[in-house]
Amino acid sequence: MMKYFLVLCLVVLGVAAVQAAALEDEKFLNLAESLAMPEESRCKARRYGCTDKAECCSEKCAYPALTCAFNWSCEKVCA
């Protein structure tokens, strides 16, 4: 009975490891796609994850509703 429990634990851990690897691959693909875009489009595409204050406050990103306002309060940060 203990052998079955250990096998089940190994299977569950294996499935979790595969899912974690797939998630990392997805993040990498999203990053690669965003880097292939022109700078203005890339900035707008980061609306769900502004990388830093300089990007958030740059002129090309000066449209908080379209860019980084979801994670950064651009009006407050850039004031």
From Swiss-Prot:
Tissue: Expressed by the venom gland.
Cellular-component GO terms for this entry: extracellular region
Domain remark in the UniProt entry: The presence of a 'disulfide through disulfide knot' structurally defines this protein as a knottin.
Glycan-modified residues: 71
Protein's name according to its UniProt entry: Toxin ICK-20
Origin species: Trittame loki (Brush-footed trapdoor spider)
Function as written in the Swiss-Prot or TrEMBL entry: Ion channel inhibitor.
Signal found in the keyword field: yes
